[in-house]
Structures are given as C-alpha cells and as structure tokens.
Amino acid sequence: MIAISVSAQTGRIGGKIIDKKTGEELIGVSVQIEGTSIGAATDFEGKFLINNVSAGTYNIVVSYISYKKKVLSGIEVKAKETAILNISLEEATKELNEIVIRGEVKKESANAVLIQQRNSVSVASGVSADLIKKTPDRTTADVIKRVSGASIQDNKFAVVRGLGDRYNMAFINGAPLASSESDRKAFSLDLIPAAVLDNMMIVKTATPDMPADFAGGFIQITTKDIPDEDQYTVGLSMGAHSLTTFKEGFSSQNASSTDWLGYDSKRGIPSGVMKTEEGRNATNSQLIDQTKLFDNNFKPTQESSIAPNVSFNMSGSKRFKSEHNEFGVLGAIAYSNNYRYTPFVVNEPPLSDEQRSMDFKTADYKTYNYSNYRRSVNLGGVLNLSMKLGKNNKFSFKNLYTQNGEDQTIKRDGIQYVNHAAPFVDQENKVFNDYLYQYQQSKMYTGQFTGEHFITASKIKVKYTLGYTAISRSLPDFKRLIYQADKQIGDTVYPRSIVQLNPDANAFTPNQTGRFSSQLQETSPSAKYEVSVPVKMFKKSEVKFGGFHQVRTRTFNARNFLFTYDNNNLDPSRYNVAGLQGPDSVFGASNIDSSLFFQRETTQGSDSYTASSRINAGFVMFDNKITNRFRMIWGARIEQFNQRVSSEAIGKKVDINKTVTDVLPSLNIIYELTENQNLRFSYSRTLSRPEFREFAPLAFYEVNYNSIIIGNDTLVRALIDNIDFKWEFFPSAAQTISINPFYKRFTNPVEMIVVPNPSFRNFSYQNASSAENIGVEIETRLLLIGLDKLAGTNIFKDMTLYGNLALINSQVNLTNSGAGLSKR
C-alpha cells in the first residue's frame, strides 16, 4: 500500500465518473487504491464508494476498457470523512494501448463540474448547494436571482429572459409544481425555503424529453439528497432592515396567536353568517344583525419595536449499508420570519379615451403615496428516503411540506383630480386616505417517487417518476377602508367621509369599502417515464423515448361583502358624524343600524369556479455523436391537452371544454471548436396555454390587481419558435466565458389588455397577432489568482469573479385588437 501517513481510524473515498466528451455517466469503471486490491466499481449513475479506508494519503487508479487509464495522486482520506472525487475519462485512440494520465484531485474535481456544463444537451444555468449555503437567501425566490438571465417579480414570481410567469415552468425532483395563483400560470417560489434545496437549474432551450409549455425557462428544483456520509447540521442567521428593525410604528393587522408559524387561527368569515343564497334575499334587519357578527378590526395595530429578521434550519441524515444494498434517510426543517417596509409613489393616468384627450386640469388623474408594511413567515420540512438494491436499481421517495403566512397592510393617501360627481362630495379635487389589510396563507405538499434501473446486458436505462402536489391558498379576510375629503384650501380641510357607499351595490369593485374572502385548492398528480437505449449509429448514439401524464384539478371560492346603506332610511346628520370617525370606530356597533351602515353580500356566481386540465404526452429523442467534435440531439414531442372550466355567469351556467393536440420538434447541435471551446445551435417549438380563469367568459374581482378582470373564451394557445446560438470558452479549470444570442417568435401570444372604464381600471385577455423577443446573455467566471502575479501578493488566490449581463428587447404586435403597436 502506497501511503504517506496512516492511522487506525478509517474514512471513505467516493464520487462520480463521466465521459469527458459527452458528460455521460460511465458504468462499471474500476476504481482502486494503487498497489492494493481495495477498490470499487461505478454503478449505473457513474457513482462509486470505497469503504473502510485507513486515514492517509493515496494514489487512486481509474481504468475502463477503451478509455485512458487515469491515476490521481495525493488523495487525502481523513478519519470519519468521505474524500469526494469527480472524475472525467477520455476515450483511448487505440483500445488496447494503455495510456496513463496523472493529475491532482482538486483540479480534477473542478474540471468535472465544467465538463458537465460543457457537455450539457441544453443551454442551462444553475446554483449549486455550496453556493446556496454561503448566501443569506431565505427562499427559492432569493436563490433564483443568482442565475444568469433570471430575476424575480413581486418577490416570488420568476422572470427568465424578460419573460414572465406565463412562459416559465417549475418542476421539483422531476415532477411538476401546481400553480399557486387563482388567475395566472405561476408558482410562488417564496413557498420553498432555500435551506431545503440541494440545487436549482434553469434550462433555457428545449429537448423532446422536456415539457413544452415554456419559452423563458424550465426551472428544475432539487431538494436535499442523502449524502455519502451521516450528517447533522444546524444554521441560524439574523438580519436587519433599515426601515423596520428596532423601529416603532410598524402597522399590521390584528394578528392571530399562530401567525408566527405561518398560518392563521383567527381571521375569516364568522360562524352564523348566512350562506350566499340566503344573504341575497335577506332583509335589512337580518343584514344588520349579520354585520355585527364580524369583528370591527379595521384599525391597524402598532408595534413598539420590530425584532430583527431571523432564519433557522436544521437537517440530519443517516445511511445504512449492507454488502450489496444501501438505505438512507434525510430530514430537514427550515423557518424564517421577515419584516419589510416599502414606501412608493404611484401616478395613475386617466382611464377612458375621452378623459385621456382632455387637458390635464380637467381630466381625472390620481397620484398616491403608498406605505406597504409586510411580515412574511415561512416554515418548511423535508423527509427524503432512498434505497439502492445492488448496483443497478435505485428508488427514492422525496417529500416536502411548506406553509407560508404573509400579513400585509397598505396605507395609501393622495389626490384625485376629478371633474365628475361622486356621492356625498362636491366636484372639486379630492384627497384620499385608504387602508388595505391582507393576510394570505399558503400550504403545499409535494412528493415524488422515482425508480431508476440499468439492464447490464443491453445497457438499457429505465427511469420513472410518480409525483403529487397539493396546494391550498386562502385570503381569510381582505379588507379595504376608503376615506375621501375635499382638497385643503388655505387652512380649511373639508370633513372626510367614507367614499362611494352605494345603496345599489351588487358587486365588489376597486373603489368601495368592504371585505373579501377566498380559498383556492389545487391538486396535481403526474407520471413521467423514459427509456434510454444505445444504438449502433455513427460514432456513438442513443435513443430515448417515453411519456408524461398530468391531471390538474382546482376549486376556487370567494365571497364579497360591501358596506352600504338604505337610501330610504339614511340619516345624513348621523352620516356626517360617523364619517369623521377613525378606522377603529367608524364601523363600531353603534354605527351599524338601518339609518347608517351595514354589510351586504355581493358575491356573484363568477366569483367561484371549478377547473381541470389533462396532459398526455409522448416523445422520441435521438442523441447522435456523429464525430469526435460533432454532436446532434433531435426529435419530437406530441402533447394532447384538455382544459375545462365550470362556473356561473349572470343567469346561466358556463362550461368551457377544449382539447388541442400539438407536435413539437426540436434540434440541438454542439460543435467542439477546440479542446476548450464549444459552439451551440438550438431550435425548438414550444407553446403557452391560457390559464383557467383567462379563457372563462366571466368577470371577477382580483385582489392583487385591485381591478375587475374579464375572461375571454376565444383565446387559443400560443406557439413559440425558439432559436439559440451559444459560444462557450473554458480558459482553464473553474473558468468560463460565454456569449448567448437568442431569438423567439410568438404566434398568437396571450396578452393582458386594459378595458377602458371611466370609474376604475378593468383588464381582460386577448391573443395578439405576434410578438418577438431578442437578446443576448453574456456570462463570465474567472479566477483572480493572476492578479497576485502582477501585484506580487497572494490576496486573490482564493477569489473568483462572477458576472452576467442580459440585453433583451421585446415587442408585441397588438394590431388585431385595435390597440396599435406596443413595445416593452
């Protein structure tokens, strides 16, 4: 045995071996300690593990038929630790000649990481587990901002290559994530704590084995896996926000005792409230009694001193091994509590064509100052199980549960320049003072069972994943209180009053005082399977075929309550007094009677719906290594998609049922210019489908937009043609420079449009005739050790410079909607 030092205690040597040219895992590679019979062979994932190695320093011999033998020197094994070797092997020019290459383990591991990127079938960027550990990132939404070409909207939705949530798709551990939003195709990435992630990749070009419903990025989230050795970790971090930490005056709703755990135990519609059908026929007396059942909780609470932001995580894993089999279990929990205050200003232009044509002094125009107070709590847990039977069979069962609670209070004040009458006010400029209270809670469970098998004789690989995701999102008691006063003239300010209390109110609208409650439930079982078969074609080839099936089922229910009055019994003198009262007392019990205020339920049939969709897909993909330098990955995917929405419009049932089948080809070409340069070309056709609410011809109030949104049953799915070029240069180990121009052509893209309304802003959806997205991404990763030679220091030896730049131009042609040409 060749060793520099040896002790009585033992460790392990493990890692993964891949083909240097293709990045493919190599099966059956011999890994031995030089001069001994101690060793192991790689399994069907290219992984190996040598147990019971005495602590010391060794030379490791790696050999495989038709590949150059490699000897790694200076491999240090420490007691009770695993030395990780990620190794690439190069094909021998003559199969029977032995060629020995000697290298150091540190360089070898760095090269293996870059080789995986260099030989990736698609253009992809990602974040590793090591980087995630070094950052203060709290959720997956924070992590994704570190990926080239990606950003986050509203602190939770992914934007990739300038394309929003509609054009991105998220998978976790190989299975799709259900949408967390009621009216859009989007997954709220802040639901998954960063502490439970192993890695995250964003694939930007399509291949036939990937779902077709994306054009920006295919987000692949992987939770923690079973490590090669037993591990137990605990992490705690604290942070400060300059506008909240240890500050007074933070506004929030009346919190429940469980808010700190991310769910509500207090808010919601009280027991005793009539069902919607009963409320529609209720008398004023019944409505008054019902209004008094609700808490008078319109006053924001104040905090004397806000605690720092805090994050905590803990994980543990255990591996059990017999002579031929392995079993592992990993558990992790993560918790975070975050406060944020955001002040901003909004200028809202006139809404109608008539108003926009007016002179500024006579047109409606609004300017608002916002104060947004937000507390967000995330709690998540992971339980992952894995089992390996022999070297050719592996099973895993991964589970993730998260719950998130977000308490948000928005205070808004400003001026509306008006030229038309409104109830109880004069035709002068108006000062607004509004309060919006929103507590949103979300719960998600997602589980994936995966099996992987390798048939030694034929070298066929089989992989399948059964997935299930369930999401619950509720808004138990969204409240809005709107005050309005005439503009101050000199030292005189007209009394404030509650704005627009409409005696004929029959729907929840953006400019009225009231409350709103909603509940969304969605489940999404799925199945994916694929078979990879080597074929004798060109220098080396493989054909992969398989299928994908997914069923989404959703229910959404909402109830609306508006404060109103009885026009025949209203006492104006009492109204003028009550209108001066603050949020704590304006809707107190003494003001709830027939001559003043009460709540009327204005829930419409269109405020609730049930929906489902079904995808059945199959694909075939060829991976041809035509020459040593030229590789082509090509094939096609067929998807049949059925979508159904059931709801109720005014006086009638609405039932939409549509089925579409698409054939979607793709081609990826990789040409190796030199040993350290690649040139890539990619073409693919993908698509984007309307979401449930978008193509249902219903009008509904959307809290997040504070607007009425109207669906459109004439919408069709959009087709997208994607073209990518990429030049990659790898100057040395752990360094890369890349330039990636891309172009996308959209046919019939679904766009949100403004529906003119003189009172408040409405939205709907329409297929534009076409759109284009063109841009370039530049990414660099450079070691700074060269600066030490210039400066005569050793300051930069462990420093790396990362940088990325994305220049993107998008243009949408809206001529078929009569809206002209719009650019963004």
Where are these predicted regions, by residue range?
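Short, acidic, small-residue-rich periplasmic hinge/interaction motif at the N-terminus
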Residues: 18-22, 29-34, 63-65, 78-133, ...
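Short, acidic Ser/Thr/Gly-rich low-complexity loop/linker segments typical of extracellular
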Residues: 36-47
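Periplasmic N-terminal accessory/gating domains of Gram-negative outer-membrane beta-barrel systems
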Residues: 76, 105-159, 165, 174-192, ...
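Short loop/turn motifs that connect adjacent beta-strands in outer-membrane beta-barrel proteins
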Residues: 226-231, 321-328, 392, 456-461, ...
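Transmembrane beta-barrel wall of Gram-negative outer-membrane proteins
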Residues: 289, 293-410, 667
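Signature of Gram-negative outer-membrane beta-barrel scaffolds
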Residues: 404-406, 509-518, 530-674
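Outer-membrane beta-barrel signature, preferentially recognizing the C-terminal barrel domain
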Residues: 426-450, 603-616, 687-746, 756-787
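Gram-negative outer-membrane beta-barrel transporters
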Residues: 742-745, 764-824
